[in-house]
């Protein structure tokens, strides 16, 4: 498995925190079962802890053109630390209706992989057209 991400836990797993979660992932990595350890969160404090820990290779966090300065700083910090950033809620959880504007915003961040949440083939066609005709 390329990436194993802890998903939206109420804390940031770390070695010796008593949960055994991070140790289990290190063991899986040592055994070649996973290549990278990541984390997802909806909470800024947990995302910040994950980056500060130096333990995670990816961070999945809400990010869109509705984002604020502290979230932009997360993206910049990920780039500096060479941590992959996966943007969940790239369409603002349904608040953004202009997919072209959302795509143009994301195109400004070469270290961000957006998760578009495509539900229909027509939506997929829209995003493919933006890629083919920037």
Language model region names:
Residues 1-5:
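Active-site gating/metal-coordination segments in enzymes
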């Amino acid at each position: 498995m390329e990436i194993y991400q802890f998903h939206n836990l109420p804390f940031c797993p770390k070695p010796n925190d008593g949960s055994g979660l991070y140790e289990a992932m290190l063991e899986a990595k040592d055994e070649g079962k996973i290549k990278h350890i990541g984390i997802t969160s909806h909470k800024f404090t947990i995302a910040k802890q994950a980056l500060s820990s130096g333990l995670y290779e990816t961070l999945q966090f809400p990010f869109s053109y509705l984002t604020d300065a502290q979230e932009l700083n997360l993206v910049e910090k990920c780039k500096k630390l060479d941590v992959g950033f996966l943007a969940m809620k790239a369409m603002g959880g349904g608040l953004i209706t202009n997919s072209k504007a959302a795509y143009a915003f994301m195109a400004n961040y070469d270290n961000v992989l957006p998760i578009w949440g495509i539900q229909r083939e027509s939506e997929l066609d829209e995003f493919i057209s933006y890629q083919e005709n920037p």
